[in-house]
Swiss-Prot record:
Belongs to the RraB family. Keywords: Cytoplasm. GO terms for cellular component: cytoplasm. The lineage of its organism: Bacteria, Pseudomonadati, Pseudomonadota, Gammaproteobacteria, Vibrionales. Interacts with the C-terminal region of Rne. This is Regulator of ribonuclease activity B. It comes from the Bacteria.
Length: 135
């Protein structure tokens, strides 16, 4: 897949992810932890990309080794996530994605998309009620 095709595919996936979250009732105004996923065959291949992602302002989570399922070709890969807090805004996430796809391309590693977690304002309401003094 070409660089341009990957960018377009990611833009489409971004909109699908956002739509699914909002349809499920996720809080539209919340800040989300956006985790961008990278993988390679060796830790050495990931190292320079992880350092550069950190310099770009992302929190870089510790790399780990994963065993692939047989239907995914088997074997092992190493991976890390570059994380940033962000509004659930397609254009902002597109900017992050484009920068990180370019980073992966530069270091000849794989950009494996992004993910986040459902955010609910119900948790905030529960937290607030826990903080209120009892009468």
């Amino acid at each position: 897949m070409s660089y341009a095709e990957l960018i377009e595919e990611q833009k489409e996936e971004t909109r699908d992810i956002i739509a699914a979250l909002l349809e499920d009732g996720s809080e539209p105004e919340a800040l989300y932890t956006i985790e961008h996923h990278f993988s390679a065959d060796t830790f050495a291949e990931l190292e320079a990309a992880a350092v550069e992602a950190f310099k770009m302002g992302f929190e870089v989570l510790e790399a780990e080794e994963l065993e692939l399922a047989p239907e995914d070709g088997g074997g092992k890969v190493v991976c890390f996530d570059a994380v940033m807090e962000s509004a659930l805004n397609a254009e902002l996430i597109d900017e992050q994605t484009e920068k990180l796809i370019a980073l992966a391309d530069k270091h000849d590693i794989d950009y494996d998309g992004w993910g986040t977690y459902f955010e609910s304002d119900e948790d905030d309401e529960e937290d607030e009620s826990e903080d209120k003094p009892e009468a």
